Amino acid sequence: MKKKLLCLFLSVVFALFLGCGRGDDCGNDDETKDEKPVIYLYPETATQVNVKLDYAGKLTCTYPKYENGWSVVAEPDGTLKDVKTGKEYSYLFWEGKAKTKYDFSKGYVVKGKDTADFLQEKLAEIGLLPKEYNEFIVYWLPEMEDNPYNLITFQNEVYTNSAVLTVNPKPDSVLRVFMAYKELERPIKIESPKITPFERKGFTVVEWGGTEID
């Protein structure tokens, strides 16, 4: 009897081993979590705006609920009102998991204790308003400030190609800020990217979000 049970156990283990031979079928260790991308809409006058997200991954949370898109009336100060429910929001929120390979060829090495000052300065340089970069910092700072160092990057096409936004009516200016970072035990040498300041004009859409890469 014991011999039969042992054989059965070994058979199960062997089957599991074979089944996990294909990375796509077992586990999601290579997935990254795109955290708290929030979308601000700033039209010149009160405007009904439809927003769709074509995401190369799985949405795990949205607010308000994403139902084949968002449809809101946006005010010049960024206040949003859901067309269907009439409820008011400050921005559109989503999170998801994908297998995006983020680019760490250029970035910044920052001591954990200096993270708040760095983010405030750099996000303002990129083009976020104080309200926007304050919300960014209070979300990410608790995850970053106790690390010895952080390797911080701001992604461009790698991110925007994996999370394509379609906004109707078409905005006049769009800023999408997505930070990917890694914790470091010690500093490394890396080239800093060139920052092109963002110019807000007409109907403006702003998004920020981020992810930690192990």
Residue ranges of model-derived segments:
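Sec-dependent N-terminal signal peptides
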Residues: 6-12
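Positively charged n-region of N-terminal signal peptides that target proteins for export
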Residues: 1-4
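C-terminal motif of bacterial Sec signal peptides marking the signal peptidase cleavage site
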Residues: 16-19
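Protease-labile, long low-complexity intrinsically disordered regions enriched in Pro/Ser/Thr
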Residues: 23-214
